Every structure is written in structure tokens, then in C-alpha cells.
Amino acid sequence: MMRPPMRITAACRLLFNVVLATASVPVLAQAPPPPSPPAGTDAYTLGPDSQPQPGVPRGKVEGPLIWKSRVFPNTVREYWIYVPAQYDPSVPAAVMIFQDGHKYVNVEQEYRAPIVMDNLIHRKEMPVTIGLFVNPGHDSETFPENRFRVSNRSVEYDTPNGDYARMLIDELLPELAKRYTLTTDPERRALVGASSGGICAFTAAWERPDYFRKVVSHIGSFTNIRGGYHYPFLLRRTDKKPLRVFLQDGSNDLDNQFGNWPLANQSMAAALKFKGYDYRFEFGDGGHTHKHGGAILPDTLRWLWRDVR
């Protein structure tokens, strides 16, 4: 006797996605470094806004500081705080939170966010903004030399749920507010990240637009590491949210078992356009590197904050 065809229920699909995502974690942890882009591509250089300029007052950077999260128990993370020279405790400051904070806070590598913020705040091309540079959690206070290899990065960054936003809202922002006067306006809070940090920035704003409404994603991993490839479809089928989104990627970005990064980012941009979002997509010829994102960070922040002072 023939058996009736098996019905694939929503629960079955969810279980399949969980198993698939879980199975991918060991592979991800052992993945080799991304290949170098072809010769003659990814030739991006830093401009004057990424260099210290005469007459521009410098903000101060504190850190690394240590945080032990309740949302992600048994993890330890580093974070840094940037405070611009123009900060006035009587005036609430805007807030910009950088994922993989060690990369963005470094003033000798590609992004040099403190220098860029010094220059743009000085010229009033962005508001007086406190920067919070946060690393993912690790299972020990002995961190790996390569901070991208901390143990909880993929769990926190690639999982498309509200846990990471909850850590920011319930833990780190209140901790920061003990020391500085911060805005409560979601239009004056931004999230920035690269690769898995890029999808993390988007996820936190997507889940909590009542807290975060500005997003910058560099070479964002909108692929099937833990289910983030669903976002272009969710964007099209979900009521528009009050978000402003900047995406950057390159034609030589990754293509592996988790997906194709250039196609994933193009799909995100197409979905944002279809839904009428305030977005910008910069698509170059770079690979899975920080050169393009770093070179255009000043213009990115000018665009992101263009109507906020």
C-alpha cells in the first residue's frame, strides 16, 4: 500500500533550519582565511578624513574594558569608549555602536573610526557622538590574538534574533549611561559592523527599531551561516520599518558553502529598494576585506547622519 506523502510542517522546517545552522558551526570555526582578491582589484586608499588633521581636537578612547554579559552567560568581552572633545554633559550625545570593536577603534588600520569621527564632528558633518566599540564574547578571559576568533562571535552575530539587541539595551547602554549623558532618541543611535558584524548590526535594528534606526553593514554576511539569508524575503513581506541602511560589498567577496556574499548583498539592496527604504548600496570590486569600507567610512557617516546634528 502506498503511503501518503509526508506533510512538511512549520515545525519540521524550523527543526531543519536549526539542525542546519548548528551543523555549520564547526565548519565555520575551522574556515580558512578568505582568499585575496584578484590582482588589480580592492585598490582602495584612505583619504584625508581618515588622517589626523591640524586644528581638529581629538577625542579620547578608553579601554579595553571588560564586560560579563547576563544575556550571554559565561562569556567575557572587551569594549572601548570614544568620547569626542566636543562632548558636553548637559547635552545628550548621539550613540554609535561598532561590532568587532577592536577593528574599528584601531587608528592604524582600515577604519580608524575615532579619527574619522574627530574630523566629521569638528566640521559638524555628524552630531556629537559617543562611540561604543564592542567585541563578541569569549569563553575565557584569555582572548585569542585574532579577536575575530573569539568563541561566541557566530552565536551572537549570525543568529537572526533579538538576543544581541537585548544585551545592548539592557546591559551595555545602561552601563555607558552611568558615565555619559546619552540620547534616548532612536534616530540618534546607529549600529555598525563588518561581515558577521554587519548582519548583526542589521539584526539588532530590525528587532528593535524603537532603539536603533541607523545601520552600516560592511561586507555583511547575509548568507546561511545561521539563517540570515532569509532577510531579503522578510524585508519584502514585512511592513516597512523606520530604518536607514548603508550596505557595502564587492564583486570579489566570498562564495562558499554558506552562500555568495555579493549576491546576498545585492538581494538585500534590491529588497530595500522594493520596500522604499532610505538606503544606499556601494558595490565595488573588493573581496572579503576592510579596504573599501574603510576608504568610504567618512562619506558613509556623512550620509548616515546627514539630517542629524
Predicted regions and their residues:
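N-terminal secretory signal peptides that target proteins for export/translocation
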Residues: 1-11
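Non-catalytic cap/lid and distal C-terminal segments of serine-dependent acyl enzymes
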Residues: 30-309
